[in-house]
Amino acid sequence: MNFITQVTISIVLYFIARISIKRSSSLYIASIIATSSYILMYLFLYQSITLLPTIHFLVTGLSLIVLFISYYEIVLLERNVRKIKLGLFENAESFPIERSYKLVFNILGVGLVFLSLALISGFAIQSIFTNNLIIKTTFTIIAWFIYLITLIGIKFLNFPIKYATRGLFISMWAVLFAYLANSYLIYN
């Protein structure tokens, strides 16, 4: 099972847990299920484990998972805020907008830490001047900058949620393109 398949399975487990658990802590429980399932799959499937490549693949997978989680949560938040503005939200008083913003901001921070660790560990394990790694490194750095700008924009510049959503969407696809293009170049 390859890297992208493991991440995809973990994200599917996140959505299953997030939808099926009907408590206020469902985000935390689903996130723990997704991240721990990825870590366990990785450690179970790869018998020869060396420290630096293992750290790199773990933090890279975790950064992708957290990127998907943050994108989903920010889209969900934007949808709920729009419903409140239009008067379509049934329990508008019970929906904590400020707490939801803080939660999304914390998720973005965790994702940025994982993406930064993935970049640092990637630079540490290999030279970036091989053909397949140039594409992966370039798009990961682009995603990191977009992610950082989104995080700074939300925290200090009061970006509207729609800009954060667009930034996360572009960042998510830049990271996915980096790994899919890398896989294509390796196997062809």
What is each of the regions a protein language model found here?
Residues 82-97:
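Juxtamembrane inter-helical linkers in multi-pass membrane proteins
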